[in-house]
Curated annotation (Swiss-Prot):
Family label: Belongs to the UPF0229 family.
Biased composition, class Gly residues, residue ranges: 92-109
Covalent S-S links between cysteines: none
Region annotation Disordered: where it falls in the sequence: 78-110
Entry protein name: UPF0229 protein Ent638_1670
Pfam families on file: DUF444
Family annotation (NCBIfam families): PRK05325.1-2 (NF003707), PRK05325.1-3 (NF003708)
Biased composition (Basic and acidic residues): 78-90
InterPro entries, A to Z: UPF0229
Lineage, uppermost ranks: Bacteria, Pseudomonadati, Pseudomonadota, Gammaproteobacteria, Enterobacterales
Length: 427
């Protein structure tokens, strides 16, 4: 009996190629499931893996089967209700496994549950931020951040079966077999020459011939025992991520924490900023992020205080814009930096302050930033701040506005704001 022993060091990844093929084939269904799942997560659990469910009908594959029509005879096991030529009625209220689960139970019908599988954190984030990029990113300076791309990098002794290099593995196999059998082959050739000489000598030396033949057989057996291929020979194509030059950038995150922002509205703003942070940290290595919280006064804070501080107060949006302008002038020269900003608010602002916000943005901020996005989170009618910003949208191409009403709008709005443009200006 022949036994196959799997001695691969990376045996746990034997199905990686099949998994990658499955993710490519059903990417649209998986992305749809992810976009629905992101809104159901807690604020602190956005970057873990995810259980993805796909309707069984969506993963059906083509198959060969007999065509309809014609006469065929079949034997179905367990049949005690029908005889030949009976017509089988369609089940009442037909079943299916992909229903919502709402309704009354019934005795008829059958179906299949949705196909559910787990994707890793990396797979989840890759699909979550696919086709997204910072708009209008330009290479306008010598100091640069790093954007990573995958490149071939020689060969490695470990890898997945999909990356195996057949030619390099066979070359190693030939070299190993040559090195391990070279001495034995020389000895074998010498014994064969000696045997031929003994066979032609007179008188016959039968015992010597028998000894030589035995040694030759043992050497040939040793040579044949050297395996044709061994795990030591296997080589896999290696890939590594290399830093690609890309202009350095800074993202300003401006969040309204005034008393008009209730906890649900703040949670939606935090979800948006967490998505933004994950996108920046995963796509670019050295993007600076400046966090600004504001009510009647604006304050630059660290990441922890930005997301978890309970401080609140009245609403003067211009305080955050003034602070951003000061920070830009002090630390981020527009000639050296690509400057971005994302502002989240419920739109509630002191009426006399909204025209001032318009003026600061139009004269000081929008002329120096690559892209400025304003997200208003409210179910109410838009107020003066939104109307002032609408005038800016008609004047500046680098200004974008979006409206979030509930959690289901967060991810679509995020993708709309940061989708990768077909014709970028970062050449």
């Amino acid at each position: 009996m022949t036994w196959f022993i799997d001695r691969r060091l990376n045996g746990k990844n034997k199905s990686t190629v099949n998994r990658q093929r499955f993710l490519r084939r059903y990417k649209s269904q998986i992305k749809q499931s992810i976009s629905e799942a992101i809104n159901k997560r807690s604020v602190t659990d956005v970057d873990s893996g995810e259980s993805v469910s796909i309707p069984t009908d969506d993963i059906s594959e083509p198959m060969f089967h007999q065509g309809r029509g014609g006469l065929r005879h079949r034997v179905h096991p367990g049949n005690d209700h029908f005889v030949q030529n009976d017509r089988i009625e369609r089940p009442q209220g037909g079943g299916g496994g992909s229903g919502s689960g709402q309704g009354q139970a019934g005795q008829d019908g059958e179906g299949q549950d949705e196909f559910v599988f787990q994707i890793s954190k990396d797979e989840y984030l890759d699909l979550l931020f696919e086709d997204l990029a910072l708009p209008n990113l330009k290479k306008n300076q010598h100091r640069q951040l790093n954007e990573y791309k995958t490149h071939r990098a020689g060969y490695t002794a470990n890898g997945v079966p999909a990356n195996i290099s057949v030619v390099r593995s066979l070359q190693n196999s030939l070299a190993r077999r040559t090195a391990m059998t070279a001495g034995k082959r020389r000895e074998l050739n010498e014994l064969e020459v000696t045997l031929k000489t003994v066979e032609n000598s007179e008188p016959a030396q039968l015992l010597e011939e028998e000894r030589l033949r035995k040694e030759i057989a043992e050497l040939r057996a040793k040579i044949e025992r050297v395996p044709f291929i061994d795990t030591f020979d296997l080589r896999y194509k290696n890939y590594e991520k290399r830093a690609e030059p890309s202009s350095q950038a800074v993202m300003f995150c401006l969040m309204d924490v005034s008393g008009s922002m209730d906890q649900a509205t703040k949670d939606m703003a935090k979800r948006f900023y967490i998505l933004l942070y994950l996108f920046l940290s995963r796509t670019y290595k050295n993007v600076d992020v400046v966090y600004i919280r504001h009510h009647t006064q604006a304050k630059e804070v660290d990441e922890h205080e930005f997301f978890y501080s309970q401080e609140t107060g009245g609403t003067i949006v211009s305080s955050a814009l003034k602070l951003m302008d000061e920070v830009v002038k002090e630390r981020y020269d527009p000639a050296q930096w690509n400057i971005y900003a994302a502002q989240a608010s419920d739109g509630d602002n002191w009426a006399d302050d909204s025209p001032l916000c318009h003026e600061i943005l139009a004269k000081k901020i929008l002329p120096v930033v690559r892209y400025y996005s304003y997200i208003e989170i409210t179910r109410r009618a838009h107020q003066t701040l939104w109307r002032e910003y609408e005038h800016l949208q008609t004047m500046f191409d680098n200004f974008a506005m979006q409206h979030i009403r509930d959690q289901d709008d967060i991810y679509p709005v995020f993708r709309e704001l940061f989708h990768k443009q077909s014709s970028t200006s970062n050449a």
